[in-house]
Amino acid sequence: MAQLGPRRPLAPPGPPGTLPRPDSRAGARGTRDRVDDLGTDVDSIARIVNSVFVWRVVRADERLKIFRCLTVLTEPLCQVALPNPDPGRALFCEIFLYLTRPKALRLPPNTFFALFFFNRERRYCAIVHLRSVTHPLTPLLCTLTFARIRAATPPEETPDPTTEQLAEEPVVGELDGAYLVPAKTPPEPGACCALGPGAWWHLPSGQIYCWAMDSDLGSLCPPGSRARHLGWLLARITNHPGGCESCAPPPHIDSANALWLSSVVTESCPCVAPCLWAKMAQCTLAVQGDASLCPLLFGHPVDTVTLLQAPRRPCITDRLQEVVGGRCGADNIPPTSAGWRLCVFSSYISRLFATSCPTVARAVARASSSDPE
C-alpha cells in the first residue's frame, strides 16, 4: 500500500458495535491521541460523505491524495463524529479523506482505497468508486461523488491528520461577486422555512430567497459593512444597546474554502436577525439601536418595527409591505420599497450558507423532515 504519512496508534478494541470514547485530548486544536474504527453501515456513510458541499485539496501526488472539508455538524454526522472540544468549533465537523490505489488490491479505474477521518477521532475505511468535478476557478476545490462503497479492512497503522499543513486563506471569494439576483415570488411560495425576517429557504428549489438593498442604497450603509439583507438592517435598528449573547452572530465557517473563520460568511448570512425575534419570536420591536439607519427602510420616523409574518407560517413574497411595517405613535408607517428587491441565491451559494451556518442548517433540516413532499 502507498505510504499514508505519519502514523498514530489505534484505540484498543472494544465489544462489537461499540465506539469507546478516547480518554486523552491534546492541544487547543481539539485533536486526540487515538482513533476509533467506525462500525457504521455503508448506506449511512454513503449519505454522509455524499452530502459534503466542497472538498479542498490538502496535498496530492501520484500515490496519495488528501482532501479536507468543514461542514455543520448535522444529525447524521452526530452518529459518526464526536463534537470538537473547542466550544467555537463544537457545532461543526472536520472530515479528512485519504485516497490511495494499492497495487495489491488490483482496483479497477476510478476506484480507490479511502480513509475518512471524522473530527480526527473516528475513521471509516472503504473501497469507493469516485467521480470528481473540479471548481471552475481552481483545482484546489472539488465536489466528490462516492459510489459502490464497501467496507474495507483497516490498515495496521493509520495516518495522522494533525501533521498536515492546512491553508488558512480562501482560494475563491464566492461572496465577492453579485450573488444577490433579483427575483419574483417562486412557485409554491409557502413551501419554505424562515431563516430571518424577509429571508426564507425554498424547499422545492433548495434556494434562499431574501429581501436585500440594491447597490445604491447599500452605499449609504456604515463603512466596511458587507451585509445588505433586511434582517441585518432590522437588527442594527432594533437591537438593545450593549447587546447580549443572542445579539452576536453564531459561529460560522467557510465551507466553500474549508476555513474555520470567515467574517464575510458571518456578515452576509441571512440568519442575522433582531435579538428579540431570534430568541423569543417577538414580532413587535422597539427602535433601540441605530435609528439613523431607519431612513433606509422608512420614509418617516418610526419608533417601532413590526414583522408581519409569523415564523411558523412563512411565505415568500415580493411585496415588502407584507414583510415589515413601522409605527410612529399610533400611525402606521409603510416601508419604502425603493432600493429594495426580493433576491434569490444560486443553489451553490444557498448550500454554502446551509453548510456554514448552524442556524440555517437546523432550520432547513427541521423543515425538510416535516415536508410532506
UniProtKB/Swiss-Prot annotation:
UniProt keyword list: Host cytoplasm, Host nucleus, Late protein, Virion, Virion tegument
Phenotypic consequence of C244S: No effect on the interaction with UL11
Biased composition (Basic and acidic residues): 22-35
Residue ranges of the region described as Disordered: 1-35
Tree of life domain: Viruses
This protein's GO CC annotations: host cell cytoplasm; host cell nucleus; viral tegument
Record annotation: effect of changing C247S: Complete loss of interaction with UL11
Signal sequence bounds: none
Major place of residence: virion
Recorded consequence of changing C221S: No effect on the interaction with UL11
InterPro entries (UniProt xref): Herpes_UL16/UL94 (IPR004286)
Keyword Zinc-finger attached: no
Effect of C269S: Complete loss of interaction with UL11
Record field: compositional bias (Pro residues): 9-19
Keyword field contains Cell inner membrane: no
Localization annotation: Virion tegument; Host cytoplasm; Host nucleus
One Pfam family from the record: Herpes_UL16
UniProt subunit comment: Interacts with cytoplasmic envelopment protein 3 and with the capsid.
Physiological role: Plays a critical role in cytoplasmic virus egress. Participates in the final step of tegumentation and envelope acquisition within the host cytoplasm by directly interacting with the capsid. Upon virion binding to target cell, a signaling cascade is triggered to disrupt the interaction with the capsid, thereby preparing capsid uncoating.
Protein name: Cytoplasmic envelopment protein 2
Organism: Human herpesvirus 1 (strain 17) (HHV-1)
